[in-house]
Amino acid sequence: MTIFLKQKYPIIFSYSLLIVIFCQGSSEGYGYKKNDDPIITVFKSVIFYGKKSDWERINTDIDTISDRIDDVKNIFAVDLRPELNAGLSQHDFQKVVKVMANLVYLTIKEKYYWNISEGLRMFTRAKVRLRLADEYYTLLLSGNVRKYDKLNGTKYHDEIFNKFTEARNTLGSTGFLGAGAVSPKLKDFEIVTKDIEQKLLIVFPYFESGKEIAY
């Protein structure tokens, strides 16, 4: 079901109010500490150096995630480069931040894509990917979702937060030495993660979501 809501005010990506949560830990299997994932570090860098109008640094940092831009293009047929390059050449900070936010959304989708492609059979990988998707949302997108909720009287942030909890519960468990293992619920995972995607598209209607994947 498609939901249409009339916003009381236009949503402008509130980079100046971006809340970054610092926490300890490591992303097993990916080799990154929390908050050290390239998507997170480059997004934060774009915000920081954008406010200083350091476009040389912004270009340099975005170049380090060219492979991630290519990844989402190859999977979802969304080429973010033309709009991103336009924003960079025009020194249009708002445009660059919007494209970066779109990249975050597509990277969240990419985590779901690989989990679904593997049928949730690789428990540790599936758990790490989902946690990264949750971090991307919490650190980089949730501030604007909360702002949207405040303007429109919605509760999308709470709903998305709860959906991530539901998604974790669908992964099952390896148990202890195989005892007490719980099988994953792939169909439930697909439904829950699709709901997260749809809610984000309501808040960020300018996001390109790409082609639907047939598994």
Predicted features by range, described:
Residues 3-13:
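Bacterial N-terminal signal peptides that target proteins for export
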Residues 28-215:
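Mature extracytoplasmic or organellar-lumen-exposed domains after removal of signal/transit peptides
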Residues 24-26:
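N-terminal signal peptide c-region/cleavage motif recognized by signal peptidases
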Residues 14-22:
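Bacterial N-terminal signal peptides
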